[in-house]
Amino acid sequence: MSEIALTVSVLALVAVVGLWIGNVKIRGVGFGIGGVLFGGIIVGHFVDQAGVALSSPMLHFIQEFGLILFVYTIGIQVGPGFFASLRVSGLRLNLFAILIVILGGLVTAVLHKLFNIPLPVVLGIFSGAVTNTPALGAGQQILRDLGVPFEVVDQMGMSYAMAYPFGICGILLTMWLVRLFFRINVEKEAQRFEESSGNGHAHLHTINVRVENPNLNQMAIQDVPMLNNDNIVCSRLKRGELLMVPAPGTLIQAGDLLHLVGRPEDLHNAQLVIGQEVATSLSTRGTDLKVERVVVTNEKVLGKKIRDLHVKQRYDVVISRLNRAGVELVASSSASLQFGDILNLVGRPEAIDAVAAELGNAQQKLQQVQMLPVFIGIGLGVLLGSIPLFIPGFPAALKLGLAGGPLIMALILGRIGSIGKLYWFMPPSANLALRELGIVLFLAVVGLKSGGDFVATLTQGDGLSWIAYGIFITAIPLLTVGVLARMLAKMNYLTLCGMLAGSMTDPPALAFANNLHATSGAAALSYATVYPLVMFLRIITPQLLAVLFWGLS
C-alpha cells in the first residue's frame, strides 16, 4: 500500500474510533466530536509501536484544511446574527464572556512563570482547558512563525489532550456548583426568563387596535405617530365588514380596526396613540385575502430594499414579517433582502403568486450549495489571515492565521449575505456536514501526532501536572465569573449556563445546559450571543501569549 493510501486509511480508522468514543455518554454527557482526538491518540500509539510511516506533508495539509473548513462554516452560520449580538442587548453577556477569556489568559501567564512550563506545553494546556480547537491551531501556527521546531510544536497537541477532558467536566461542575451555592430552582428561573423575554430578543407580536383618537381621523397611515417608522407594520385594515391591505397613503377613519405587527414595547406605545386593543378577529379566512410565507431565492432581488420592490403599489400586497436565519424581524421598508429570507405576504391569492414569482420562492434552491462563494470566501480568509500585523517591541508579527482569517471573513460575508449573483447562504445540513468533516480531520491529525508519546508522558512524564494546570485554567475563570454574574448582575441561571458554555465554545456543555430545562431556550440564546466574539478572542489569545512569552524569554 502506498504511503498516501496508508495515511488516508489510518485517518479513516481514527475517525471511526473517535466518533464511537464521542457517542459514549455517561449520565447524558460525552466527549462528542472531541472523542476524535482520543481516537487519534489511541491509534497513534499503536501506529508508533508498529513503526508505520505516514505521510507528514499530507497530514499537515489535512490538519490545516480541516481547521479552515471548521472555522469558515462557523462564521457563515453565525455571521447574520454576530453584529446584532454586539449591540446593547448582548453587551452584558459579552462583557462577562470576555472577562472569562481574560482571566484564563492571566492564569495561564501566571502558571507559565511560576512553574516554568515550556511555551508549547502551556499553550496546549490553555487550548485544552478552554476546549477550543481553533485556539490550538492558532497557537501552533504562531509558534512555527517564531521558528520553534516542528517536533516541539507538536507537544501542544499532547498537552491539549491532557487538559481537554477536565475542560468539559469543569464547565459542567461550575454550573452545578453555582446552582448548589445559590440554591437555584431551575423551573422558577425558566418562568422568569419567559416573563422577561419581551425585552431585547423578543419575538414579534401582533395586536388589533381600534382607531379612537379623533386627531387621527382622515390621516394617512404613514403620518400616524408610531406607524411612520420601521418598527411597526400595519398589514390589515378592517372598515365595517371590509378587510383590506392598507398602503402607506391609506386614510384611516375613526372606528377602523388596524392589525399591527411589531415588538411588544413598540405595539404598546402605538396603542397609547391610536386607541384600545380589541379582540375582534382580522383573520383572512372567509375573505378574498390570504397570508403566505415566501422564500427569497431570485438573485435579481438580492440586496434590494423592501421599499424598492413596490409590492403594495404594483400588487396590493403587504410584507408583514421577515424571518432571517430563524430570527423574526419587522419587515421595515429599509431592510435589504438576502438569499433565504422568508417573507410573510398579505394580499389576494393571485397577487401573492405574482410577488412569489418575482422573489423566487424556489424551495429546492435552499438545498443547493453555491460552491464558488465557498472557495472565494476561504481564499479571501486565508489571505486575510496571512496579513502580518507588526506591533513595536514584539519579536514576530501577529496574524489572524488560518483559524482567524477565514472566521473573520466568513462573519463579514455571512453578514453581507450576497454580492450580485453570489450569495453566501449555506443550507444548515451542508454547513454542518462541512463543519463536522473539518473538525474531524483536524482532531484526527492532532491525535495521531500526539499518540506516540502520550502514554509515556502520562505515566512517566509531566502528564499529571499538566492536567492539574489545566484544572486551574478551567475552574478559576468560570467559578469567578459565574459567582459574580449571579451575585452582582442577578443573571438568570439558564442564561448564565449558556453564557458559560459559550465562553468556552463547548457544544457538549450547551447540550447539558439545554437539558436543565427542556422547553426553555435561554441557554441556547445566550450561547449564540457570546459565541462569535469569544471564538475570535480564543483564536487571538494564544497568539498574544506566545508572542509575549517569547519576547520575554
From Swiss-Prot:
Keywords: Cell membrane, Membrane, Repeat, Transmembrane, Transmembrane helix, Transport. InterPro entries: AAE_transporter (IPR050144), RCK_C (IPR006037), RCK_C_sf (IPR036721), Transpt_YidE_put (IPR023018), YidE_YbjL (IPR006512). Gene3D superfamilies: Regulator of K+ conductance, C-terminal domain. It is a multi-pass membrane protein. Residues 192-276, 279-361 form the RCK C-terminal domain. PROSITE patterns: RCK_C (PS51202). One of its GO terms (molecular function) is monoatomic cation transmembrane transporter activity. The chain crosses the membrane at residues 4-24, 28-48, 65-85, 95-115, 158-178, 371-391, 403-425, 437-457, 464-484, 493-513, 532-552. It holds the Pfam family Asp-Al_Ex. One of its GO terms (biological process) is potassium ion transport. It is found in: Cell membrane. Belongs to the AAE transporter (TC 2.A.81) family. YidE subfamily. HAMAP family: YidE. This is Putative transport protein KPN78578_40470. It comes from Klebsiella pneumoniae subsp. pneumoniae (strain ATCC 700721 / MGH 78578).
